[in-house]
Amino acid sequence: MIFHANPGVIDLGINIDHVATLRNARGTVYPDPIEAALQAEEAGADLITLHLREDRRHIRDADVRALRPQLATRMNLECAITQEMLDIACEIRPQDVCLVPERREEVTTEGGLDVAGRFGQVSSACKQLAAAGIRVSLFIDADADQIAAAAACGAPVIELHTGRYADAHTPDELAIEFRRVADGVDAGIRHGLVVNAGHGLHYTNVQPIAALAGIKELNIGHAVVAHAVFVGWQNAVREMKAIMVAARLGTRYPAAGKPA
């Protein structure tokens, strides 16, 4: 099988949040989101995205601090607009910070940031991050007013929320939501913004979004983590069995993954 990983065509940001979710579910130190990030880079990821939520439900402060100096690509840190999060971002200095809305009761980010309604707060956050040498992105709905507000508050990048497209239940609804995203891309470019997109994208719905020439980067996480369960599962089972058999026979099974 041939994988096309042409650099510069469209960037893939791998979100490692749900590797941390799996780790935290049992209170273990594995799977290690740092290792997941580094392996994603080896596999062709153009950047690593992670969301430090206020409740630390998946990614933890220590993850962000440990990962930042190890990345060969870019870190895209997602966070809410709180002074605590802005100060952490300015301390760690990822290449990119994507400001997102956040509610503790939500399972995942449910919508875009209301830049127009919170203009002063968003603008102030953009200035603080920019002063620390961090490129700022705003996670917003594909709405003309929000896109205009994002440009006005000084953010050079927007990430369009594709959740409504991903959750569409009928062909007509899908077409409407796709057009909304496509129009949002065009509007962002007219305002001189770099346009990224993400949320809810997976292996069978990403193609139309990725085909939009104006999109620079897609950030995808849960779908990749979920798919890895299946495409890597048989190898994981075989290796565990081989380790067990080797231990029973008193032979050595090297960490490289092949029996001695």
From Swiss-Prot:
Coiled coil: none annotated. One of its GO terms (biological process) is pyridoxine biosynthetic process. The keyword Cytoplasm applies. The active site is at H51 (proton acceptor), E78 (proton acceptor), H199 (proton donor). Its EC number is 2.6.99.2. 1-deoxy-D-xylulose 5-phosphate binds at D17, H18, R53, H58, T108. It is found in: Cytoplasm. InterPro entries: Aldolase_TIM, PyrdxlP_synth_PdxJ, Pyridoxine-5'_phos_synth. HAMAP family: PdxJ. Belongs to the PNP synthase family. This is Pyridoxine 5'-phosphate synthase. It comes from Cupriavidus pinatubonensis (strain JMP 134 / LMG 1197).
